[in-house]
A protein has these predicted regions:
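A conserved short coil-to-beta-strand element within the FAD-binding core of flavoproteins
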Residues: 121-136
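Glycine-centered tight beta-turn/hairpin loop motif at sheet-sheet or coil-to-beta transitions
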Residues: 139-142
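Central helical "cap/lid" subdomain
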Residues: 36, 45, 147-196
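Short beta-strand to alpha-helix junction loop
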Residues: 56-62, 89-112
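N-terminal Rossmann-fold NAD(P) dinucleotide-binding loop
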Residues: 13-14
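Glycine-rich FAD pyrophosphate-binding loop
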Residues: 5-7, 18-45
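Short hydrophobic core segments
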Residues: 5-7, 29, 125, 145-159
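N-terminal FAD cofactor-binding segment of flavoenzymes
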Residues: 19, 40-84
Length: 212
């Protein structure tokens, strides 16, 4: 039996897994086909891909800046070059906040942190049960695994469904609405304009980005 089961392979889950793996045994599970979570990337060809999750990362805290600086040194991420146009007058770009993207897609951070860790994709957790301080984790394919400890980094609706009976904190009963976004991924002929993103003044079309 391993020490930890971590559900979710986004930046949070990957960071926790990377840190714990130095001392403990663990497995990471994700219902998606690959690592990334909110920073998912869809590969189109060997050299082309779409970051259809988070568009970029803008580190603000001292700790996060240090974390990103280390990834910049290792060439896992890079600064997002080009102009960023804010056509919405209610929104203004903060020039102090640098924009960081993955060198090979925004899921590069998770993939780097998880490179030596046992990851299980296409693995959806449907139920958790605690018996004598041992966690029984059930999956959609009918299989079950036992772990000493369990860490959930999945989206709140899934977290609430799985863990409500075990979490006593008041936040678990909050009604949190998650708004869906529709992402259109397009390949167009290269243009000479040095513009990396548009923030539109439109109720429906909010953002257009060109990075990976």
């Amino acid at each position: 039996m391993k020490d930890f089961c971590i559900i979710g392979s986004g930046i949070s889950g990957a960071t926790i897994a990377n840190s714990l793996s130095k001392k403990y045994s663990l497995d990471v599970y994700d219902k998606a086909r690959g690592a990334g979570g909110r920073s998912s990337n869809k590969k189109l060809s060997k050299n082309e891909s779409f970051d259809h999750g988070v568009q970029y990362i803008s580190p603000k805290s001292t700790q996060f800046k240090k974390f990103i600086k280390n990834l910049l040194t290792k060439k896992i991420v890079k600064k997002w070059p080009g102009k960023h146009l804010f056509l919405n007058t209610d929104k203004k770009e903060d020039k102090k906040h640098i924009k960081i993207i993955g060198k090979k897609g925004n899921n590069a951070i998770s993939k780097h942190l998880l490179k030596d860790i046992d990851c299980n994709f296409n693995s959806e957790v449907v139920k958790i049960f605690n018996n004598n301080k041992i966690w029984e984790v059930s999956f959609s394919d009918g299989s079950k695994k036992l772990y000493k400890s369990l860490i959930l980094t999945c989206p709140f609706p899934q977290l609430k469904k799985l863990s409500k009976r075990y979490i006593k904190h008041s936040f678990i009963n909050k009604k949190i609405k998650m708004d869906a976004n529709i992402t259109v991924m397009m390949v167009i002929k290269k243009r000479k304009l040095n513009i990396s993103s548009y923030f539109f003044n439109d109720k429906i079309l909010g953002w257009a980005g060109n990075e990976n």
